[in-house]
Amino acid sequence: MKKEISKIVGENLKLARKAKGLTQTQLAKELNKYQSDYSEYESGIIQLDYEKIVYLCERLDITPNDLFGIDN
């Protein structure tokens, strides 16, 4: 279950990033991470912590529900 959620979050993160015209490298720098680390967020390998979820939702103009694939 945890792995499935990480994959959903990663896919939605990638879609939102691309919709904003941003690169993995750009967002990685904003998070003080390497691009390879950021790539693992989008691949669902590394889970995001609370602060990164909040930052990325605000930065990408999405809600946590959007990120987690939850329909209202």
Q: Which residue stretches match the model-derived regions?
A:
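A detector for short, charged/polar N-terminal pre-domain segments
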Residues: 1-8
